[in-house]
Amino acid sequence: MVQNIAILGASGYTGAELVRLIATHPSMRIVALSGDRKAGMAMAEVFPFLRHLDLPRLQKIEEIDFSSVDLAFCALPHATSQAVIAGLPRDLKIVDLSADFRLRDPAAYETWYGKPHAAPELQKEAVYGLTEFYRDEIRAARLVAGTGCNAATGQYAIRPLIEAGVIDLDDILIDLKAGVSGAGRSLKENLLHAELSEGTHAYSAGGRHRHLGEFDQEFSKIAGRPVQVRFTPHLTPMNRGILANVYVKGDPQAVHRALTERYLTETFLEVLPFGALPSTRDIRGSNYVHIGVIGDRVPGCAMVVAVLDNLCKGSSGQAIQNANLMLGLDEAEGLRLAPVFP
């Protein structure tokens, strides 16, 4: 049975990535696309690379008839999703790609996002969408909150190590490099080619990045006590991709073994042989995560390197993986695409 899909916010990068992936999904059909500022336009006018697809024209959200929609992806900006989702039919399954429902604690949300949550009841209802760790909850959910792309990368490297008890919880450092598409499609001076090309810089440093809220929430939940990591992201002049260097105190072989055992049966998680390190070029355009482990020159320390595509596994691909579960499908359906290389 083919499921009818609506994509709200289809004129942004994550919306376009959803369209690209769903276009070849055997059990999903796009029946509605929204882009309020581009309503009435064809997707080919907004994204010429989608020209060959037979897609509905962009509409305003209030113009969409949701009575025939089985699931909606909400790829709207942060803070916008709250009001929009609150106005959607209560029986509609929703995967939200914004930050609006990732944090369960209203006080934590206000701390990291600077204002009270506008839909606290939905915040309580939402299930955190890190698929490999919340499958059962996602299957039963009506509303799933997509993870932050940086938060997902760090968690794939660290969660199994906390679960296995093989690292010091008080000494975790995440040094992360992210592609520019993670900043969205809107025009920003610091994202102009001349400003970004041939350089890289740290941003939201000193414990100010909002994805720290997700790390705090998830790692503390696993450990059963507060866990705070040090995390600094860097913007790099590549379109797609995230690479996280994670420094931990723990036996390198035990770290590698914990990751290998945890992800042994996972379709999209690949732990490389000990000593081999992954590259963003090897996962570009795919839903795969590659993880490598090496020992440090300091005895009893290890470095874990994780890479994923921020637009795919870090956002739209994982959203589809979650939607598959919510719709009773094989979670990997439509997502077994080989990475794009070179």
Swiss-Prot record:
Keyword presence, Zinc: no
Catalytic activity entry: N-acetyl-L-glutamate 5-semialdehyde + phosphate + NADP(+) = N-acetyl-L-glutamyl 5-phosphate + NADPH + H(+)
SMART domains in the record: Semialdhyde_dh
A Gene Ontology cellular-component term: cytoplasm
Pathway it works in: Amino-acid biosynthesis; L-arginine biosynthesis; N(2)-acetyl-L-ornithine from L-glutamate: step 3/4
UniProt xrefs under InterPro entries: AGPR_type-1, NAD(P)-bd_dom_sf, NAGSA_dehydrogenase, Semialdehyde_DH_NAD-bd
Keyword annotations from UniProtKB, A to Z: Amino-acid biosynthesis, Arginine biosynthesis, Cytoplasm, NADP, Oxidoreductase
Gene3D superfamilies, sorted: Dihydrodipicolinate Reductase, domain 2 (3.30.360.10), NAD(P)-binding Rossmann-like Domain (3.40.50.720)
EC number assigned by the record: 1.2.1.38
Localization (cell): Cytoplasm
Keyword Protease: no
Active site per database record: 149
GO molecular function: N-acetyl-gamma-glutamyl-phosphate reductase activity; NAD binding; NADP+ binding
GO biological process, one term: L-arginine biosynthetic process
Pfam families: Semialdhyde_dh, Semialdhyde_dhC_1
Summary of the function given for this chain in its UniProt record: Catalyzes the NADPH-dependent reduction of N-acetyl-5-glutamyl phosphate to yield N-acetyl-L-glutamate 5-semialdehyde.
UniProt protein name: N-acetyl-gamma-glutamyl-phosphate reductase
Species of the source: Cereibacter sphaeroides (strain KD131 / KCTC 12085) (Rhodobacter sphaeroides)
